[in-house]
Swiss-Prot record:
InterPro entries in the cross-refs: Globin (IPR000971), Globin-like_sf (IPR009050), Globin/Proto (IPR012292), Hemoglobin_b (IPR002337), Hemoglobin_oxygen_transport (IPR050056)
Similarity field: Belongs to the globin family.
GO terms for biological process, alphabetical: hydrogen peroxide catabolic process
Organism placement in taxonomy: Eukaryota, Metazoa, Chordata, Craniata, Vertebrata
Protein name, as recorded: Hemoglobin anodic subunit beta
Length: 147
């Protein structure tokens, strides 16, 4: 992926402002509520039968925080995201058997939560474009093992 300096700045400056313990759980909860078929990968999380159960599930929140924390690897390796996520791609493909489209769905929910948090004056269209490009690079890297 080729990054412009403006894209790098938009991505890294927003990353410094993100509270991963806020955005991560929000995005994961939304994913599991809006896209309930994704719940099959989280059977060990306990009760996911209702939106209220998902909203109050500590394991969902913790996994959302873990996922957001994992984005730091991509931030630190923007010029080689595919290799930075090689082992995670293998794990999600060969061990967990996650549908790679779920990565894209979660990226959409992360973007939505960021837009809601920062608002249109701070999460401008240009910032959104950079973040979507970044998250698509991450999802592509995670799906790499599937190809």
């Amino acid at each position: 992926v080729e990054w412009t300096e403006d894209e790098r700045t938009a991505i890294k400056s927003k990353w410094l402002k993100i509270n991963i313990e806020e955005i991560g759980p929000q995005a994961m909860r939304r994913l599991l509520i809006v896209c309930p078929w994704t719940q099959r990968h989280f059977a060990n999380f306990g009760n996911l039968s209702t939106a209220a159960a998902i909203m109050n599930n500590d394991k969902v929140a913790k996994h959302g925080t873990t996922v957001m924390g994992g984005l730091d690897r991509a931030i630190q390796n923007m010029d080689d995201i595919k290799n930075a996520y090689r082992q995670l791609s293998v794990m999600h493909s060969e061990k967990l058997h996650v549908d790679p489209d779920n990565f894209r769905l979660l990226a959409e929910h992360i973007t939505l939560c960021m837009a809601a948090k920062f608002g249109p004056t701070e999460f401008t269209a240009d910032v959104q474009e950079a973040w979507q490009k970044f998250l698509m690079a991450v999802t592509s890297a995670l799906a790499r093992q599937y190809h």
